[in-house]
Amino acid sequence: MDIFKKQESNVRSYSNNFPVVFRKAKGCWLETEQGERYLDFLAGAGSLNYGHNNPVLKQALLEYIEMDGITHGLDMHSEAKAGFLAALDNYILKPRKLDYKVQFTGPTGTNAVEAALKLAKKVKGRSSVVAFTNGFHGCTAGALAATGNQHHRQGNGSSLTNVTRIPFEGYAGVDGLALFETMLNDNSAGMDKPAAVLLETVQGEGGLNAASNEWLQRLSKICKANDILLIVDDIQAGCGRTGTFFSFEPSGIEPDIVTLSKSIGGYGLPMAVVLLKPELDQWKPGEHNGTFRGNNHAFITAAKALEIYWSNDDFETHIKQCSQNVSEVIDRCVRRFPQMFVQKKGRGMMIGIECIHGDLAAEIAKACFDDGMVIETAGPDDEVVKFFCPLTISESELNQGLSIFERAVETIAAKHFKQAS
């Protein structure tokens, strides 16, 4: 551990909560240098929806490397890229009757958000955007300006501008969309007409706040009526995490731009894309570029993941069942321990439980880790315990993790509160 304390920057965060050295991983399990095993209910913050070292994806990648397939090719054509584009079209876009062009950005989610914002401003000729309270979109300047969290924003060191923040659904009891519409139609409101609205349908780092279908439909209607582009940040909520491939599918809306990263690469390899309606593809060649636009190794595993998990409804059915199992445990804990918990948050397997304060959530997460499970928190006060296991988890493994969580809750309840029956 000394090497990390000596040489790695203080900016590290997850490792502070899990002070062990991991050596290998498979499925939903992590293993330390000493051979201790931990259930992974963090899954790379949603980057490992198909699990660690998924054997089918690993085999496809090994075969590609063995035949000396292209590793790095800037944005040149490659068989790997063609395979991914075909898989995305065949298994995701066509079945949902979605017509998007694909832009490969730098390999992180914030790269995709920056590109989406830049394109929206270019197309509309406007400099401002609208974002929402408790939203998180990345830590580079443009994405950070649209992020609500003070902890991340204050690390910038300079002003973060050209973003108007509107209350997300349920925030402080305010109808944010009514306010937004009023401000758009009031010349004295002080809000310049935005190029785009940027949102997460389920706010990951903001505390798993889930927008209703009706709210999303209202927002989409407002954007269309006012010639404003709608950008959905599906970096954490996409690729099945909320139960469908895109988080916005249940609402029936069709965003103008969608950003994807994290699990889009299938194997945990860096990859990010922007999906944009064809009429918005107004880039000039090389106008938005980068050395690592498109990871050919990730193309291989991404295409295989789409083929294996999204060619029929079996995977969605499995996610739905997992979500029901987790929901039952959360609902039971909320009923049994009202002095500890407020409510269930999120949807699908982007789900969690809101504690009465962040210290309690941290204590639960630590107790889980001490009992062999990695689990994290989210929210303004880190008050929400997030259940973010790989979506490929088996029922027995899921139940094992839920048992660890319930044991932690019961231990802490006995320590601090009079236990409910």
UniProtKB/Swiss-Prot annotation:
The modification N6-(pyridoxal phosphate)lysine is found at K262. One of its GO terms (molecular function) is diaminobutyrate-pyruvate transaminase activity. GO terms for biological process: ectoine biosynthetic process. Pathway: Amine and polyamine biosynthesis; ectoine biosynthesis; L-ectoine from L-aspartate 4-semialdehyde: step 1/3. Its EC number is 2.6.1.76. It comes from the Bacteria. Pfam families: Aminotran_3 (PF00202). Its cofactor is pyridoxal 5'-phosphate. Keywords: Aminotransferase, Pyridoxal phosphate, Transferase. The keyword Transferase applies. The keyword tRNA processing does not apply. Gene3D superfamilies: Aspartate Aminotransferase, domain 1, Type I PLP-dependent aspartate aminotransferase-like (Major domain). Belongs to the class-III pyridoxal-phosphate-dependent aminotransferase family. This is Diaminobutyrate--2-oxoglutarate transaminase. It comes from Vibrio parahaemolyticus serotype O3:K6 (strain RIMD 2210633). The gene is ectB.
